[in-house]
Amino acid sequence: GEEIARGEILVDYLLALEPDDVEESVDGIETIEPAYGIPSKWIRPENRDKAEMYGYTVIEPLAVMLSHLSETIKRHSHELMSRQEVVRLVENLKKTAPELCEEAFPGVISYNLLQRVLTMLLREGISIKDLETIVETCFETISENGLPVKDVDQIVEKVRAALKRTITRMYCEDGNMKVVTIDAALERTMVNSLSRGENGMYLAL
């Protein structure tokens, strides 16, 4: 296999993540937290209380490793979405939504189409836990709107809209979301400049 990530753990130390506004520093070995790229320090356990008092977030070595492993899997999960995995997911969905699966597969939604939809969502970091909503949206988009099955981009656009709560939750912190707005005229220009090519939508400015 090929290496996709690496990191280093100092088992006799704790990892202290630096706060945004460091007022006091603690002694330690400077490093970068591997999962999110946060400036950090490996500190001795006896310095834990001091680090936390200064605003550092202190993490055990095992938690660092598990976090790095989890984030690495998330970033590359789209590469793991094989045809066999799609079949397994559909078989599990049949247990909770048998009528939907009977209508959708394989007459309207092919396993190949669902694989492409799920892969695109995972590549964007969107959770596919709500598989029933994803499949139902694909089914409705294709059967009711008469959308060509080959137009995966438009199908995924409909799925994103159906997963709006899941997606917005990803960017919320304590129930609040930070946003950036642009001038309405610029927004219209960008929307009107959207073009569709072989590789999906792009801005033709």
PLM segments and residue spans:
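Membrane-embedded alpha-helical signal segments
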Residues: 1-205
